[in-house]
């Protein structure tokens, strides 16, 4: 089954961008490459049970099994040793990426309290967007009774855009609610 946003991209966004930005080739039109969901575990690195809970929650949210990220070197100030677990991440591509973005735009972000839109200044110079969420409860898959602690996550949307303007225009076409 083709995802709704993927269909929107191929049928509406590509022709619009091809005309508006006057590309010479249809493959120059920016597209989504991947979405990376990352969650640092902080003080929970000593507790394997909490690590498994984070991994399970992220897998439920993303629809794909996550990977435990480990430290590359020891840092005494943070009480981190080499190869110690420091986070959990998931990289989404293809249909799962479009499905997650659809749920993020239409289900999760509207459930944020006092939501005014997301900050359009969080783009890097290559047109990639990074977003920080403060709680996992905004996703309908997460049940309030089953979580032990409210924690946030970082979401990075990687595009093939050449600059910030193209990236912003692409994500606006997908329906991400940016602040005015």
UniProtKB/Swiss-Prot annotation:
One of its GO terms (biological process) is translation. One of its GO terms (molecular function) is rRNA binding. Its main location: plastid. It is found in: Plastid, Chloroplast. Disulfide bonds: none annotated. The keyword Metal-binding does not apply. It comes from the Eukaryota. GO terms for cellular component: chloroplast; ribonucleoprotein complex; ribosome. Keywords: Chloroplast, Plastid, Ribonucleoprotein, Ribosomal protein, RNA-binding, rRNA-binding. Transmembrane segments: none annotated. It holds the Pfam family Ribosomal_L5. NCBIfam families: PRK00010.1. Part of the 50S ribosomal subunit; contacts the 5S rRNA. Binds 5S rRNA, forms part of the central protuberance of the 50S subunit. HAMAP family: Ribosomal_uL5_B. Belongs to the universal ribosomal protein uL5 family. This is Large ribosomal subunit protein uL5c.
């Amino acid at each position: 089954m083709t995802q709704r946003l993927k269909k929107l991209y191929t049928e509406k966004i590509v022709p619009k961008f091809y005309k508006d930005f006057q590309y010479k080739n249809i493959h120059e039109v920016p597209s989504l490459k991947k979405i990376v969901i990352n969650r640092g575990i902080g003080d929970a690195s000593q507790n394997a049970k909490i690590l498994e809970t984070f991994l399970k929650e992220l897998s439920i949210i993303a629809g794909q099994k996550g990977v435990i990220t480990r430290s590359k070197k020891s840092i005494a100030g943070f009480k981190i040793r080499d190869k110690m677990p420091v986070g959990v991440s998931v990289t989404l591509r293809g249909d799962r990426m479009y499905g997650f973005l659809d749920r993020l735009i239409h289900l999760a972000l509207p459930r944020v309290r006092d939501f005014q839109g997301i900050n359009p200044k969080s783009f890097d110079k290559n047109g990639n967007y990074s977003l920080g969420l403060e709680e996992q409860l905004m996703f309908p898959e997460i049940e309030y009774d089953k979580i032990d602690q409210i924690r946030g996550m970082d979401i990075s949307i990687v595009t093939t855009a050449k600059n910030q303007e193209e990236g912003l225009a692409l994500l606006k076409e997908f329906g991400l609610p940016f602040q005015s």
